[in-house]
Each structure stands twice: as C-alpha cells, then as structure tokens.
Amino acid sequence: MNNTVLLAVSMAACLLGGILRKFLTDRYENGIFAYQFYNAAVSLTAAVALFAVSGVPEASPFTVMLALLFGLVTLIQQVTNMQALEAGPLSYTTVIISLSTLIPTLSGAVIWDEKISAVQVAGIILMVACFVLSVEFGGEKKKASFRWLAFCLAAFLCTGFIGVMQKWHQSTPYSGEQDAFLIIAFAFSFISSAAYCAVAAITKKGLNKDKENGKKKILALVPLIIMLVSGVCVAANNKLNLHLSGVMESAVFFPTVNGGGLVLTLLASIAIFKEKLSAKQWVGMALGIVSVILLCNPF
C-alpha cells in the first residue's frame, strides 16, 4: 500500500486515540494512578491486538533487547514528562518536548546519510515555529526551575531517542520482526504500569482522595471500553509508524507525524470539544500545514 495512505491511516488512528483520551480526562478522574491504569489497559490491549493478528512472532536477540530498551526509555519518558508537567509551566514543557522531533528528524542525515534539501530545512524551521505558536504562554502559577528543566531535558532526550530506536530497528536485517518488537515493548509497559497500580492499591499511595470537582471514577465500564478502543488505535498507530520509519526519509516522516498530528489535534479541539484558538494559534496551525507540504519536497 502507498506510504502516504499508510501515514494517513496512522495519523487517523493517533487522532482517534487522542480524542478518546481527551474525553476520558475531561469526564473522569485524573492523577498518576488513573494515568498508570490507563497506560496498563491500553498497553495490554495493544499487545493482545498485535498478537491476535500476527500469532507468535519470531524475535531475534537483537529485537528482544532493543524492544526492552524501547520499553524502558518509553517508561522513563512518561515519568519525566509527568514530573516536568507537575514541576513547571505546561506551555514551556509542551514546546520543549514537542521539539524533540528534531532528534529523529536530523538522525537520518547524521546516522543514515539521508539527504535534506533546502526546502525541507525551511519546512523544519516552520515546524518549530508551529510548535511554539500553538501553545498559549502566560497566566500559569508554576514557574521554571532547575528541577523542572532537568525533567524537561530528560523527557526531551527520551522522546527523541524513541524515534531513533524505531528507525534503528527498521534499518537492520531484523526489520521484519515488527510485531515481536512492539508486543515486547507493550508487554514491558503493561507490566510496569500494572505493578505501580498494584503497589498503589496496597499502600493507598497515589490514589485520588477527592472526586476532582465531581469527575467520575476511572474504574467503570465506559472508561474500560474507551481504553480497549484506544489500545487498538495505539497498536495500529505504532505498527504503521514503525514500518514507515524504515521506508520514509526521517526529515519527512517524523516532522509530518508530529506536526501534522498537532494540526489535526487543534482542528479536533475546535470541531469536537468547541475550544477556541487565539490568533497566534491559528498562525501556528497554518505554519504547520505549510511545513508539512515543504517537508514532502514537492518542488
């Protein structure tokens, strides 16, 4: 199937997963326990979905080790991202971590000798501007600190390295072991989050003690159904992204996925959740669309 079609399907799956997650966070309790429970349910569903499609996939020692490393880095990224959001301003945290897409984007040229044209460089610059303009600054109680910056940088590096590992695996003779790679990574993620939930349930630490302004409990039928659907979306998104990272140029794939995903998220927030964008955010979205066009190097 055409890579453009696969990319569109991947981004659609990612968007649907994001919409479902937004629905959950708006109506049901949040907090670290709810997040870890969500991650455990989604990761387990994704692993089972991939297993159901592929059966018992073959896995070389290289794939097993890289998948475990991928799962560990993803876990560290999740923890440091949450800590950064807790310790400092949301706006700056969002921009800094979003810019991590530059790491896998430039890795194609630095590690795999991929060529980046002047038009694509312009697209990357516009993508950076899109990330910055799409976030509203000011009016936040939390201030920047050394602790916040340390967590931000850790999340930035981990997020970027996740993309590099995808590209790395798909650039080896073991690229056909996609299902094994993802199943192992999702299993690692499930075990980590499930272990946290178990410890939290036993010790009563990390559990939400209030109703969060009347929000419903996450342990209910509707949230579980949403998590199951989200897990299927995550499985499809990650499987397609892993494949595309090996067959598309890094300077095209990673900025398009991240920048295009941001534009789609902004559009969904307007159409579905009736959110209003500032003039600056509209400019950011327009730059994001132009940057994706330039990254595809149509000239």
Please place each PLM-identified region on the residue numbering:
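Polytopic alpha-helical membrane proteins, predominantly small-molecule transporters/carriers
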Residues: 1-299
